[in-house]
C-alpha cells in the first residue's frame, strides 16, 4: 500500500521453524524506502546473523531462547538514524539526566527507563560468553543434525503428521507434529508424565499461523532442540511418540 512505512517480519517461525528470506526482504525495503524490522527470537544464538548484510533497520531478540540466557531478558538493535526518530514506549528515571523531566536523550538510557534487571543481564552476559566460545556455526550444525534426525524418524511413525518443511536445511530447530489418533494435548501430557519429555502444545500464541498450516483449533505438539540435546534424547522422543501414536485408548 502507498502508506506503508515499515515491514516487520520474523526471521524464523516459532510454529513451524521455517526460515524467512530476510536478506531479500531487506533489499526490497531499501529499494522502496521502507523500514525493515526483524524479529530474531527464534534465531539469535542459533544462526549467524549480520544485521547490516540483511539490511535491517532494527533487530529485536529475546535472551531466554537460543541465547541461553534467563527469562525476562531481551533487547533490540537500532540503526542510529532510526534511534533518533523513535519515541520511547516508557520513560522515567534512569539514574542519569535526573534534571530532565523527559529523561535522557542519549543511548542506551533513552530506551531503558527504570531499574534494569541486573541479575538477568549478568546471566545473559554469561550465556553470551559461553556461546562465543562454543561458536554459532557449531551450534547451528548440531541443532540442524538433531532436527534432521527427528524429521527422518518421525516420518515413519504411524498416525503422525509432520508440519512444515520436509528437510532441516531451511528451518530452525523447531518441529511441530500432529497426532491423527487423538488430541495433541493428550499426547503432550503423556510425553511429560510417562516419559519425562517436555514439549509445547497448542497454538503457540500464533492462531493465524495455525490456520494457515491447517492445525487450528487444536494446534500441534512442538519439539525444539538446543545445543545441550543429544541424538539419544531425540531417539527417546521418537520412541515415545511412536508408542503414543499407536495407542488406541485414551482416558
Task: Report each predicted region and the residues it spans.
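A short glycine-threonine-serine/GTX helix/turn-capping micro-motif
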Residues: 105-118
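A generic structural signal for well-ordered alpha-helical segments
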Residues: 29, 154-155, 191-192
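Conserved PLP-dependent catalytic core of the aminotransferase class-I/II
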Residues: 119-167, 171
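Active-site phosphate-binding strand-loop segment of PLP-dependent enzymes
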Residues: 1-45
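Active-site PLP attachment segment
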Residues: 54-98
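PLP-dependent enzyme catalytic core of the Aspartate aminotransferase-like
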Residues: 193-194, 198, 209-251
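Conserved PLP-binding catalytic core of the aspartate aminotransferase-like
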Residues: 144, 148, 159-203, 207, ...
